[in-house]
Amino acid sequence: MRSSIAFLSLALLLVAADAQAAVGSRVLVQDDGSLKINGRVVHLFGIYMPKDGRICDNSIRPIRCASRAASALRFRIRSVVYCENVSKNRDGSLNAVCLISSRGQIFEPKTDLAAYLLNEGLAVALPNAPFEYKTIERIARSQGRGFWGFFADSIN
């Protein structure tokens, strides 16, 4: 009983510490699809976002143009982003698994941003990616999603 109370207390402290760090973080999706969090560049672990045609959002000023993956991330990220560092690159940037909740609540199921892009057909799984990422990519490819199909705006 005592050990389960201690475990629960530790779990709540970790969640509270995670939430506090995440809430204080400002997240900016850069044009290449990487995230800028507290001044550090974070790349989504396990995926590569191919350079594709740039699309522009003219609903905001100044007009922003970015890759399809970056535009999809900007659209999807409407709440706190939780990232867990996996590795560090030579340039000081991080590779991380980043999750979001749909309504910004701590105890809500989270969406993996890399898995989201793979599912939309806007990224490919790298060789060191988790098995789940490779499976999601295969499903998107078989269903012709994203760049596995065709883009309506590229028809001449």
PLM feature spans:
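Small beta-barrel nucleic-acid-binding modules, primarily SNase/OB-fold domains
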Residues: 18-156
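Positively charged n-region of N-terminal signal peptides that target proteins for export
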Residues: 1-4
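Bacterial N-terminal signal peptides
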Residues: 6-15
